[in-house]
């Protein structure tokens, strides 16, 4: 049995804890607020500010974990290097967690060091630099903070008149006091995919069938598997994913995102060194092993006998229309649970924010079925669940 310190206790962490419990592991779930989803199923829990390096060190010394598993980005990640030097396994590695939290570090690694195809980009530390970069790239363009998550501070800028707002919005959405943005060429893509990639301690890099997804404001709204893409494009994406994960080092599951264009091929977008929100579709039984089980096996060094597509699946999120500190209630349960070949997952978050993700609907069908119809079904059913 390993003692695992989970940093971040959202819905993805909750599913990871469930997988770990089924393999007899001991989990300490941490977050900045009490009653977070993963805490509800963990052995122990801690509530503290994970951006506070001293507090993070105190918790690590208190519990002396064998493994630290970051589940979110709001962590004082540079401290992970110290823990790794002390002999604690950091998942997938301290280098990976630090690089992927900073868009500047990961973009320069991908584009300049590894030669992966990405959108054209510049950095801006002031509104004037942002205006200069936009003039070089042209409109529309995408402006993002260097450090943020779930689309915070991200905007699509269609004209020079919108740049001042994009600058303020980006800086306000940035983590900490960093006032530097990345400005990117807007890629006219035909689709987006997540390629769940598994790096192992004692085995080859493995890939899950590609997952298509739809985002709004930089945040996931629906996903489906398998995404139908050109085999040559898939091979190109797999090669890129293997190259970047190898450079970042470590064992675990990664969510590697790509833009696909019929005319221009595959563009690397970004990656997360942990289970991916779009990968929740694997909870519909689309694979023989879901993304959380794969992550756990890679972390523990357990064998993975191969990844197989078992059936097709689609997911659609349930969002809160309200903001309240009261425990949320849900309508529509009876109607939704009466649907065939459908799972409903309510995450158990103790309070709401407007557009906070509170649950997900998962639908499945045999291989060869109509995936578009399944996507429509998942969205239709998700709309029946009301958060109040």
Curated annotation (Swiss-Prot):
Transmembrane segments: none
N-terminal signal peptide: none
UniProt keywords, alphabetically: ATP-binding, Ligase, Magnesium, Metal-binding, Nucleotide-binding, Purine biosynthesis
Binding positions (Mg(2+)): 257, 270
UniProt-listed Enzyme Commission number(s): 6.3.1.21
One Gene Ontology MF term: phosphoribosylglycinamide formyltransferase activity
PANTHER family given in the database record: FORMATE-DEPENDENT PHOSPHORIBOSYLGLYCINAMIDE FORMYLTRANSFERASE
Protein's name in the database: Formate-dependent phosphoribosylglycinamide formyltransferase
Source organism: Bacteroides fragilis (strain ATCC 25285 / DSM 2151 / CCUG 4856 / JCM 11019 / LMG 10263 / NCTC 9343 / Onslow / VPI 2553 / EN-2)
Taxonomy of the source species: Bacteria, Pseudomonadati, Bacteroidota, Bacteroidia, Bacteroidales
Gene from which this protein is expressed: purT
